[in-house]
């Protein structure tokens, strides 16, 4: 099929930059064909934001009457997020929670003071919290939505990947940075100090399960590399099941009573996050490192490879993906890092309209060192 008319109708500017229209057509054609991943190495200045938004609108028109097409665009920097908002006024943006001042002067959503305020009945996020309300519109109603990479990775699948909230397409801008972000945010950190707000709502016996899980690693040293064995998987599964049960009980409690609803909602969010992180750790099939351990107090586990955590971080939450960057620097290596099967991918390397002699590359004479 020829999608040229759709592209012309939805492109936001009078003229296309060199290679821009071809990139849009390539993405749309392969999305319609069912490719799960579209890898696009696009030169700086081509206009990636217009490519992303035009692809969304063309796909929405193609799918009209068949499905409610939703696109999530994720960026690694606040500056790039602002650029998207400047270029397209119809995008609905969710920023980091620190960007939403609290009307109760209790810090950002999910902070210790916020949880204390909610626990005391001083706030109901659904009616009083700008971040919470914006997040709900973003995930449930916005069909062209924008957020930061951190939120997309850290948000549990039940929050942004269920039937009500799931995006049809996720556009990963500056995708050359996504592997580091995935490893960073996939780290499993259990700190008993952080469980105080959960304990007030869920009880001491419940939070004691976390300390017991920490102690399952007492025989290992910090810096130890390992693959979760059957015993660790069993321990993690028991904790996940306990978390799921408690979250279900709290959701029912929230429905039955308006008092304390805010604190319960915050705790449910935390519990969902724990369950997602634990599942990613125990059942990803990859190697992990014990970064930090303190008996019955703290445990930090970090994945060794990106591909072992990418499903929980990204792929389980959406159906199709566009990976865009000016510096992918090798499609095969990127696919290996990101756990992408060649049969599921289409790639395009758009030519740079700027002559090579005007694009010098400078090598920085620097290395990383530790003190």
Language model: regions and residue ranges:
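Walker A/P-loop
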Residues: 33-55
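Conserved pre-motif I regulatory segment
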Residues: 1-41
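Pre-Walker A (Motif I) flank of P-loop NTPase domains
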Residues: 32-39, 69, 143, 319-320
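Conserved Walker B
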Residues: 142, 149-150, 174-178, 182
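A contiguous, basic/glycine-rich beta-loop/short-helix subdomain that forms a polymer-engagement track
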Residues: 125-140, 155-162, 250-368
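Conserved helicase ATPase motor motifs in RecA-like P-loop NTPase domains
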Residues: 41-45, 195-213, 318-333
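A substrate-engagement module of RecA-like helicase motors
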Residues: 2-10, 15, 44, 60-145, ...
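Conserved phosphoryl-transfer catalytic core
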Residues: 176, 180-237, 241-244
């Amino acid at each position: 099929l020829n999608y040229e008319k759709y592209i012309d109708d939805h492109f936001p500017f009078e003229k296309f930059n060199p290679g821009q229209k071809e990139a849009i057509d390539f993405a749309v054609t392969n999305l319609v064909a069912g490719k799960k991943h579209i890898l696009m190495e696009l030169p700086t200045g081509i206009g990636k934001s217009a490519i992303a938004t035009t692809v969304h609108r063309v796909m929405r028109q193609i799918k009209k009457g068949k499905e409610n097409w939703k696109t999530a665009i994720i960026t690694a920097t606040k500056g790039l997020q602002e650029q998207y908002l400047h270029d397209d006024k119809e995008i609905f943006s969710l920023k980091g929670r620190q960007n939403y001042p609290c009307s109760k002067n209790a810090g950002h959503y999910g902070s210790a003071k916020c949880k204390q305020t909610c626990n005391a009945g001083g706030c109901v996020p659904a009616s009083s919290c700008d971040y919470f309300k914006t997040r709900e519109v973003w995930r449930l109603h916005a069909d062209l939505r924008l957020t930061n990479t951190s939120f997309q990775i850290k948000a549990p699948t039940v929050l942004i990947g269920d039937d009500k909230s799931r995006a049809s397409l996720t556009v990963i801008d500056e995708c050359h940075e996504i592997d580091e972000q995935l490893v960073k945010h996939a780290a499993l950190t259990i700190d008993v100090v952080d469980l105080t707000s959960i304990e007030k709502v869920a009880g001491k016996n419940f939070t004691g399960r976390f300390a017991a899980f920490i102690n399952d690693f007492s025989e290992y040293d910090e810096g130890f590399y390992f693959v979760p064995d059957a015993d660790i998987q069993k321990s993690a599964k028991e904790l996940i099941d306990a978390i799921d049960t408690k979250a279900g009980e709290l959701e029912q409690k929230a429905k039955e009573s308006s008092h304390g609803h805010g604190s319960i909602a915050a705790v449910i969010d935390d519990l969902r996050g724990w369950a997602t992180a634990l599942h990613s750790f125990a059942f990803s099939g990859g190697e992990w490192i014990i970064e930090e351990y303190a008996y019955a107090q703290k445990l930090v586990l970090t994945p060794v490879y990106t591909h072992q955590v990418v499903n929980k971080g990204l792929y389980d939450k959406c159906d199709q993906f566009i990976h865009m960057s000016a510096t992918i620097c090798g499609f095969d290596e990127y696919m290996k890092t990101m756990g992408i099967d060649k049969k599921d991918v289409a790639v395009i390397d758009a030519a740079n309209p700027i002559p090579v002699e005007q694009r010098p590359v400078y090598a920085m004479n620097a290395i990383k060192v530790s003190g």
